[in-house]
Amino acid sequence: MISPQEKQDKVIRATDLDALSCRYSANNKSYFSKPDPFIDSLISSYKMHLPLCTGYTNMSANRTLRSVFNEQKLPLINRGTYLRTESIDVITQEFIKEFKKCQVISLGGGSDTRCFRILEEHGEDVRYCEIDFHESVKIKKLAIINDKKLADIVKYDEESQSITSKEEFARLESNIHTENYHLIGYDLRELTGALDSGAILEYVDTSLPTLILSECVLCYLNPKENERIIEFWKNAFASKALLALLIYEPMSLNDAFGTTMTHNLSNRGINLLTFNEYPNLEARYKFLSEKCQSSNVKLTDMSNVGGYDSDNTTKAWINSKDLARINRLELVDEIEEIRLLLKHYCLCYCEFSHSPSLKTINKWKWILE
């Protein structure tokens, strides 16, 4: 029997499977201009090792995996996944292009494959750190060490491992540390602003311009934990290199659609603790600029990113050629429906430092800045 906290953590970890299945679907439908060759390795590791995780049996793990990967995703979900992935990718690539030698820290990196794409292209210049729950990290570690291509990309040269029991899985060291890649098992809720989390900072280079990514991660923490985690990173980089934060997550907008989202998530045992606390772009701007004391704050909803609220010719997030391409992939009948859905997801960027800002952050159209 698992504890209530373990049960809640299991629910949160399961959202990583949701995200992976959405990327898998969008990839299979050819939404990404460059197909993602790394997704299958993560899925294989999940299929092999999810039964070994806390709260799962072979039967329940297989049922969960069938549920998420056999489900046909709606076109609006595939399009939303594309816009989410593409918008974060373009900002990350611009950050790397502008600063050359830099660092990316992914909070709740889980099954995300962005690290492999970036290190494959920029491995000599970019230091990449991923932090997530221990069990999520172990599944990713096993994907890496049992796939030569992934191991070569992150420069991991130890032998592959076969883990077949819960006992072996529990004993497995979760972390990977190579020259430019660090995979760290850590509960982000344990971070404090006091810089007492040496397990993290030991592998972070605070002299490098750094972009922190949070994709649907901070939304599972309460507002105080949000402040504490941001304060931790702010203190770590105080008076040093540029620290930038990029957040993607849902917001309620205090409307009927937001209420429906809340009920649907609640039925799955998911409580988005910032969903109603910061219900719109204005509330999030105030949180980042006033409570967190960040600068160069910029926010948009994903409807704007997808070009549903503008002519998409000035400072467009997605160029007209790519928009035309994805419009041909699947028919989306209800434009108003996808616009409404995308209105409830936001992209937030801000900086902490007196160092030079990311100049090219202004190349895209933001709603609030």
Curated annotation (Swiss-Prot):
**InterPro entries, A to Z:** LCMT1 (IPR016651), Ppm1/Ppm2/Tcmp (IPR007213), SAM-dependent_MTases_sf (IPR029063)
Upper classification of the organism: Eukaryota, Fungi, Dikarya, Ascomycota, Saccharomycotina
**Catalysed transformations (reactions):** [phosphatase 2A protein]-C-terminal L-leucine + S-adenosyl-L-methionine = [phosphatase 2A protein]-C-terminal L-leucine methyl ester + S-adenosyl-L-homocysteine
Q: Keywords in UniProt for this one? A: Methyltransferase, S-adenosyl-L-methionine, Transferase
Coiled-coil residues are none
Q: Is Lipoprotein found in the keyword set? A: no
Pfam entry (one) = LCM
What GO MF terms are annotated?
Answer: protein C-terminal leucine carboxyl O-methyltransferase activity
Q: Which family does it belong to?
A: Belongs to the methyltransferase superfamily. LCMT family.
Can the keyword Transferase be found in this entry's annotation?
A: yes
Q: Which cysteines are joined by disulfide bonds?
A: none
Q: Which organism is it from?
A: Debaryomyces hansenii (strain ATCC 36239 / CBS 767 / BCRC 21394 / JCM 1990 / NBRC 0083 / IGC 2968)
What top-level class of enzyme does the UniProt entry assign? transferase
One GO biological-process annotation of the entry reads: methylation
**What's its EC?**
2.1.1.233
* Protein known as: Leucine carboxyl methyltransferase 1
Q: What's its job?
A: Methylates the carboxyl group of the C-terminal leucine residue of protein phosphatase 2A catalytic subunits to form alpha-leucine ester residues.
Q: What are the binding positions for S-adenosyl-L-methionine in this chain?
A: 84, 108, 132, 187-188, 215
